[in-house]
């Protein structure tokens, strides 16, 4: 229980840091007049995939898949716990890392011009006249948090399904339905990332790098708890594969159980 409490505490701390960084102001990067066209896209009020929906998909999808697998395969509580710990760590680390980069880089969004100058008229000093909160949020383009969270949560779901379905082991290779089922979450993550460019909220580099960050954390945290996908036991967490210390002691040969040497043909020598 103590180890579990520590694990939960680490994740709570990371999510706390993530929420804290959400309210910090980013670096105010100087925008040169010749590059203003990059940030002059229209300001879209209604997103294709709102932030709340993105968080719901990224957080609830892996949890729902884990619960469905438990019902179908009747997995034990230990396996469910390990899966929850792995995906929660991936999401927490991803959030902290993505927001940290956002604040340090301070890249303007594609619609930054109309956040800064709502009337479409730029003054000579280039001092923003728009809502300060909207302007500050407009300097958090790189990388895309929609993309990073989508690829973190749904990317983990892909690795989890690939392990459960043995997509890359001898028994599972060549069965296309297994591979399609495993990569479906990644397809959904890609659609979420691309939607941010359609909303003029991110440049393509923002979505691409965000996806890479999310996928890296998804794989790292998955491998912390599960064997490689090519392993024959990839459907089980490491905890379930470890041999308990009590069993190890029972397997050790004792003096009574040690094999005896044959005595035939052995005679006593002279004293």
Swiss-Prot record:
Site positions (Stabilizes the active site histidine for nucleophilic attack) are 206
* One Gene Ontology biological process: Fc-gamma receptor signaling pathway involved in phagocytosis
Q: Provide the residue span(s) of the region labelled Phosphatase sequence motif II.
A: 143-146
Q: What is its main location?
A: membrane
Region of interest (Phosphatase sequence motif I), ranges: 102-110
Active site (UniProt): 146, 202
The UniProt-reported impact of residue 202 to A is:
Loss of phosphatase activity
Regarding tissue, the record states: Expressed mainly to the brain, kidney and testis, and to a lesser extent the bone marrow, thymus, prostate, liver and uterus.
- Where is region (Disordered) located? 250-271
**Residues annotated as transmembrane:** 4-24, 49-69, 84-104, 142-162, 179-199, 202-222
What keywords would UniProt list here?
A: Hydrolase, Lipid metabolism, Membrane, Transmembrane, Transmembrane helix
Region (Phosphatase sequence motif III) spans which residues?
195-205
Activity regulation (record text):
Magnesium-independent phospholipid phosphatase. Inhibited by N-ethylmaleimide.
Task: State any single GO MF term.
Answer: phosphatidate phosphatase activity
UniProt cross-references to SMART domains, sorted A to Z: acidPPc (SM00014)
Q: Which reaction does it catalyse?
A: a 1,2-diacyl-sn-glycerol 3-diphosphate + H2O = a 1,2-diacyl-sn-glycero-3-phosphate + phosphate + H(+); a 1,2-diacyl-sn-glycero-3-phosphate + H2O = a 1,2-diacyl-sn-glycerol + phosphate; 1,2-dioctanoyl-sn-glycero-3-diphosphate + H2O = 1,2-dioctanoyl-sn-glycero-3-phosphate + phosphate + H(+); 1,2-dioctanoyl-sn-glycero-3-phosphate + H2O = 1,2-dioctanoyl-sn-glycerol + phosphate
What result follows from mutating residue 146 to A?
Answer: Loss of phosphatase activity
Which pathway is recorded for this entry? Answer: Lipid metabolism; phospholipid metabolism
What broad class of enzyme is this? hydrolase
What InterPro entries does UniProt report for this protein, alphabetically?
P_Acid_Pase_2/haloperoxi_sf (IPR036938), P_Acid_Pase_2/haloperoxidase (IPR000326), PA_PP_rel (IPR043216)
- Bilayer topology annotation: Multi-pass membrane protein
Q: Which PANTHER family match?
A: LIPID PHOSPHATE PHOSPHATASE, PHOSPHOLIPID PHOSPHATASE 4
What does the protein in this record do? Magnesium-independent phospholipid phosphatase with broad substrate specificity. Preferentially catalyzes the conversion of diacylglycerol pyrophosphate into phosphatidate but can also act on phosphatidate and lysophosphatidate. Phospholipid phosphatases are involved in both the synthesis of lipids and the degradation or generation of lipid-signaling molecules like diacylglycerol.
Under which name does UniProt file this protein?
Phospholipid phosphatase 4
Q: Which organism is it from?
A: Homo sapiens (Human)
């Amino acid at each position: 229980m103590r180890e579990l409490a520590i694990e939960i505490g680490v994740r709570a701390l990371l999510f706390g840091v993530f929420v804290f960084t959400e309210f910090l102001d980013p670096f105010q990067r100087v925008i040169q007049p010749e590059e203003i066209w990059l940030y002059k896209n229209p300001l879209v009020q209604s997103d294709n995939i709102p932030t709340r929906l993105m968080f719901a998909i990224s957080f609830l999808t892996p949890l729902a898949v884990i619960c469905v697998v438990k019902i179908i395969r009747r997995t034990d509580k230990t396996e469910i716990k390990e899966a929850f710990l792995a995906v929660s760590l991936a999401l927490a680390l991803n959030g902290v890392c993505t927001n940290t980069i956002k604040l340090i880089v301070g890249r303007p969004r594609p619609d930054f011009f109309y956040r800064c100058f709502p009337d479409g008229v730029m003054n000579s000093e280039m001092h923003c006249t728009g809502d300060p909160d909207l302007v500050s949020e407009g300097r958090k383009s790189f990388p895309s948090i929609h993309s990073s969270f989508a690829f973190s949560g749904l990317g983990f779901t892909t690795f989890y399904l690939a392990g459960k379905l043995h997509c890359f082991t001898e028994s599972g290779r060549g069965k296309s339905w297994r591979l399609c089922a495993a990569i479906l979450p990644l397809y959904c993550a890609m659609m979420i990332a691309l939607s941010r460019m359609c909303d003029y909220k991110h440049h393509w580099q923002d979505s691409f790098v965000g996806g890479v960050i999310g996928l890296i954390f998804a794989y790292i945290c998955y491998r912390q708890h599960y064997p490689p996908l090519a392993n024959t036991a990839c459907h089980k967490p490491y905890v379930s594969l470890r041999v308990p210390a009590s069993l190890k002691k029972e397997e050790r040969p004792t003096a009574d159980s040690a094999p005896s040497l044959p005595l035939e043909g052995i005679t006593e020598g002279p004293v």
